[in-house]
Amino acid sequence: MARIVGVEIPNDKKVEIALTYIYGIGKTRAKQICEATNIDPNKRVRELGDEEISKIATFIQQNYKVEGELRTEVMQNIKRLIDIGCYRGLRHKLGLPVRGQKTKSNARTRKGPRPSRIKKKK
């Protein structure tokens, strides 16, 4: 398994798909990385040489925020919304949907499991 930006990339996958295992890189960005580094996206990871792997790794580090750096930025953005007390920040704080979805009957993922209603027997 190749290691790029601290993430183990599976050997049996194509480069384009394998790069999506890195947090912050989707299919479109993976294609852009392959084009910029002149690597065939349909090539398997095990077929890549050390030089090509290091080429991909340096390109990603220089041009994109990925993994821990991206996660901390997202957390800081959410914390900033909470600190300034805006509506979106309050929704994050309360653990409710942020983008205007209805919550009367849905939003179970965001709200968590239903509170149990166990009645006492007399």
UniProtKB/Swiss-Prot annotation:
Pfam families: Ribosomal_S13. One of its GO terms (biological process) is translation. Keywords: Ribonucleoprotein, Ribosomal protein, RNA-binding, rRNA-binding, tRNA-binding. Residues 97-122 are annotated as: Disordered. It comes from the Bacteria. Residues 101-122 have a biased composition (Basic residues). InterPro entries: Rbsml_uS13_C, Ribosomal_uS13, Ribosomal_uS13-like_H2TH, Ribosomal_uS13_bac-type, Ribosomal_uS13_CS. Signal peptide: none annotated. One of its GO terms (molecular function) is rRNA binding. GO terms for cellular component: cytosol; small ribosomal subunit. The keyword Oxidoreductase does not apply. Belongs to the universal ribosomal protein uS13 family. Located at the top of the head of the 30S subunit, it contacts several helices of the 16S rRNA. In the 70S ribosome it contacts the 23S rRNA (bridge B1a) and protein L5 of the 50S subunit (bridge B1b), connecting the 2 subunits; these bridges are implicated in subunit movement. Contacts the tRNAs in the A and P-sites. NCBIfam families: uS13_bact. PANTHER family: 30S RIBOSOMAL PROTEIN S13/40S RIBOSOMAL PROTEIN S18, SMALL RIBOSOMAL SUBUNIT PROTEIN US13M. HAMAP family: Ribosomal_uS13. Part of the 30S ribosomal subunit. Forms a loose heterodimer with protein S19. Forms two bridges to the 50S subunit in the 70S ribosome. This is Small ribosomal subunit protein uS13. The gene is rpsM.
